Amino acid sequence: MMHLAFLVLLCLPVCSAYPLSGAAKEEDSNKDLAQQYLEKYYNLEKDVKQFRRKDSNLIVKKIQGMQKFLGLEVTGKLDTDTLEVMRKPRCGVPDVGHFSSFPGMPKWRKTHLTYRIVNYTPDLPRDAVDSAIEKALKVWEEVTPLTFSRLYEGEADIMISFAVKEHGDFYSFDGPGHSLAHAYPPGPGLYGDIHFDDDEKWTEDASGTNLFLVAAHELGHSLGLFHSANTEALMYPLYNSFTELAQFRLSQDDVNGIQSLYGPPPASTEEPLVPTKSVPSGSEMPAKCDPALSFDAISTLRGEYLFFKDRYFWRRSHWNPEPEFHLISAFWPSLPSYLDAAYEVNSRDTVFIFKGNEFWAIRGNEVQAGYPRGIHTLGFPPTIRKIDAAVSDKEKKKTYFFAADKYWRFDENSQSMEQGFPRLIADDFPGVEPKVDAVLQAFGFFYFFSGSSQFEFDPNARMVTHILKSNSWLHC
């Protein structure tokens, strides 16, 4: 009898250790995910037993708070939509407050800030990382009095680095997906710094995690902004891969938040662009949303985009999303209409306008003295009587001129045409239409306009990544 009892005792641990069913395992996994998520982003105290009690009012309230903040149906339950959102990639900063700012509204007490890129991800060329960070800084610079300059050594206000797992700040990264990056609010030392998880696949486009978008979001934190519950805002905590990076601009929610800390940008000390006469009405005027619309020339000017067509141009800026429509002669009475090409050299604060075998230089509203000049003074051969398009690469200080199926490259530093040109457009810009009407550089891409289409060209991958309608820049 004792022998039988001993067998029964031996069996008890075995019988109580049957594996959980698939559904039970999944439920436990979901609870673990939710517990970690709410602890990390919604200030839930670490208490496993409490979380396992289904009727815990605190847990229900935390889930409801998360659902409300992220725009989900507020059920207080770990439903499918809630769990799906918990698995999405996002910023590693908690969602514990309103969009406006961190508790106590920390802000920088100065308007000129320094930044330093401490190290680089192996996923991208160094110049691509530099460009993404510069563009992200410009997003906030354009709507505030803030300015930024780069340091290459020493301690900057904003130290930017790539790291994996535990990296010395008590906020470990978690591998690919989930937490993409985190940043600290304004202040000394670690404060203001940005850390990117280098286990992510960082890209210039939407094929992986877009570095520009994440950097712009994290910079919002470095400047004092917290997360926004507005799903259209850059400061919304979940990563949103904009399919059309060319169309990116801050939401009004983002602008309101950052300007509540620093105010709007100061009025320009330069002459504002003011038209001298209004646009006449008439059927000959181009319609911005005409599906067949093409452009004569495109240029940037002091942070704005100018799209020229016939006697007119559209003017688009980040701070005024609705394009303005003007006569060319209303701003520059001495310039011709029906232009061939235009481009800006940022370092000289000058836009160059081309028509036929002549070109003009403008700064703001002023056409510069000594113009027009002949295009052959730039180094073109006598056989070239006009150019079709031009664009200046501000990082490389090179200007590209396109004529028929060839292009030339001009060095802005030496002010001379480079040797080895012209070259065939098809050889160096594969996939682009040979007849180029205009070219624009933005967001790390070149946009080649040909008729009613534009070709988004990635210069690092040397390939066309998107084909869009030319007037998509005008919100059509």
From Swiss-Prot:
Subcellular location: Secreted, Extracellular space, Extracellular matrix
Annotated positions binding Zn(2+): 91
Intrachain S-S bonds: 289-476
Keyword annotations of the record: Calcium, Collagen degradation, Disulfide bond, Extracellular matrix, Hydrolase, Metal-binding, Metalloprotease, Protease, Repeat, Secreted, Signal, Zinc, Zymogen
Molecular function per GO: metalloendopeptidase activity; serine-type endopeptidase activity; zinc ion binding
EC number from the UniProt entry: 3.4.24.22
Family: Belongs to the peptidase M10A family.
Upper taxonomic lineage: Eukaryota, Metazoa, Chordata, Craniata, Vertebrata
Cofactor note as given: Binds 2 Zn(2+) ions per subunit.
Residue ranges annotated as propeptide in the record: 18-98
CDD domains named in the record: HX, ZnMc_MMP
Pfam hit, one: PG_binding_1
Catalytic activity: Similar to stromelysin 1, but action on collagen types III, IV and V is weak
Role summary: Can degrade fibronectin, gelatins of type I, III, IV, and V; weakly collagens III, IV, and V. Activates procollagenase.
Name of the molecule in the record: Stromelysin-2
Cofactor: Zn(2+); Ca(2+)
Top class in the EC scheme: hydrolase
